[in-house]
Amino acid sequence: MGWGIVPALPGVARAAAKLSGMQSWRASLLWFDPEADGPRPHFESDGLLVTAADAAGVQRVVAVGAYDTLRPRYSDVAVHDRRGRLIAPGFIDLHIHYPQTDVIGSPADGLLPWLERYTFPQEARFADPGHAASVARFFFDELLRHGVTTVLAFGTSHPGSVDALLGEAQARGLRCIAGKSLQDRHSPDGVRDETEASLRDTEALIARWHGRDRLGYAITPRFAPSCSDAQLHGAGALAARYSDVWIQSHVAENLDELRWVRALYPQDRSYLAVYERFGLLRRRAVYAHGIYLDDADRALLARTGAAVAVSPTSNLFLGSGFFDYAAAREAGVTLGLASDVGGGMSFSPFATMRAAYT
């Protein structure tokens, strides 16, 4: 979480107050300035946050700090008094499945039975654009209720599911990166896609959404077992062609899944190595879970710049295991926290952080 602060001379700021739509809020403030201070937080118990519109009409942070220090500089700017409340940057959820919103808390004996029994039947409903739009609205309502303003999200295998999600995010001015799930094998009717059509759909979605307002696209192989070699090869080719898009998938979440991958890909050293072979490890690649990685895998992640989305509530609920934070940090792996709804039990980042501390 962080605010990009636009420098402004006090005299210029006052003169431009009416023209720029300048506003300010008095409250307790928590913020980060990673370029100046790394991960160190800043806190003001009585702070002032000042914003103004840029040339495009987007509100930007002009100043943030102690109320007594900043108020004289912006004395003619109206103040919204929110004392007793905390203002902070929005949270980021690094891995979430919006189509699984309605399967939260559905019990099963591990990941693979859970997918078959609950997830795939629910995701098949997203062939209906009306259903996708309804869930997208509720999904963002819940995220905002819990202070989340940026997500890296899975759609279903239906392109319309991504259109519904990104369209809703755009309407609300939120930061959302999402992708259509690629899964041309080992998936039931209703969610299984066709190899060539899935790649054409992915490229069309990139053209339609990537870089539009605050939106981005993620090439999204569901996980290696759900994708044929041809589909993974095509995904890697798209990742090379569109180097600024994201990649998202799952890796090493569950022991049964791990055994399945070994049977499907005996030529690869590890589950993660499958993605490497198809050109799917690089910066802007995010892999969820990563519970059963070894030292060579962690070194590969650090070398390629790919990141892991740690999903503690999901890992606990589905009985998958515990992530090795110490080994990942020692190897220099980039990490982020994720709710992994609907395997995860809550949209709340605080619930995710509590589970991570367990």
What are the functions of these language-model segments?
Residues M1-R73, R85-L86:
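N-terminal metal-binding scaffold of metallo-dependent hydrolase/deaminase domains
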Residues R277-R284, A326-T358:
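His/Asp/Glu-enriched, well-ordered alpha-helical/loop segment
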Residues D102-S134, K180-T195, N254-R284, T304-A307, ...:
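Active-site gating loops and adjacent loop-to-helix segments of metal-dependent hydrolytic enzymes
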Residues G105-L174, S198-G211:
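Alpha-helical scaffold segments that flank or form the walls of functional sites
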Residues G173, A239-D244, L280-R283, L300-A309, ...:
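Glycine-enriched alpha-helix->loop->beta-strand junction motifs that scaffold or abut catalytic
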Residues L49, Q59, G84, H95, ...:
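Divalent metal-coordination and catalytic microenvironments
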Residues G160-G290:
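Metal-coordinating catalytic core of metallo-dependent amide/deamination hydrolases
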